[in-house]
Amino acid sequence: CLRESLSFVTSHELVNSEKSKNKLAEDTTGGQKRESLSSMHLNQNQNLPFGILALGKLGGNELNFSSDVDLIFIHDNETITGNLEFDHKLRIKAARLLIEVMSEVTEEGFLARMDMRLRPGGERSPLVLSLDETEFYYTASREMWERQALIKASPVAGSGQLSKDVMNMVKPFVYRSLLDEEVLHDVQKVKERIEEEHLREDHLNIKLGVGGIREIEFFVQTFQLLYGGVNKQLQLTGTLQVLQQLIKTRLIPKRDAELLQEAYLFLRRVEHHLQLRDEHQSHTIPSSIEQQYALARSLGYKNLDSE
């Protein structure tokens, strides 16, 4: 476990996080699937009665040590029992059990903190939505933050056809075929709302603060939203991968992309070490000088000026 932790916080931790995504997909379709289907008195050889779309750090293959796992549950139009109302209840029951099993705290900890608030309609909507309901919602939505969230969308469970149908629905919502200059204004509004909330904090936040992780992600996502509809090379979920494509497409200078990549990797390393130390989701640099020194030493900085 220690060896895995040390390996994870090297400069390669973001590039190699595909294993984390695969592990979640295996767990979701493995033991958790069996429990969910058993509770529904269904054949264990069947798939889950819905597909799972990952967003956020899981969708982008960028998990850290204490990431929330943002998911959306979507089902196709295939019937389970022949009764639509009963099918809906079965799907909701399976979804609740899946969340409970994956979030359950045991002696070994828990698999994931699952966050379902990014689903269409948020907490006001059912846990599982049909593909048609999801498409109708996004067709009517004008919220930039939802387009940004779906940049990271990646199927992690469900039938291959459902996954394909979901992504075919998501892509046109995120990536517009015509250049939309309103993107700049809308992204700026989202950023300002985050900054207003962050200004209430007294401590330095490496995620939401000026020059932090979120600012780099917003910079990259703005290019994706502007040009991704006409340049499919930008339709990627990982921040580092998109930076490489921004170089290849000459949308930003190579040196600028390299500086952003270096800053992003450094801030993510700090994030990992903060969460290893605090054992919870933390993005705040400690105010204590002693704790700051301890954090710096854990990052490999040995010769620290004591003044």
Q: Where do the language-model regions lie?
A:
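A nucleotide- and high-energy phosphate-metabolite-utilizing enzyme signature
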Residues: 1-20, 24-26, 31-307
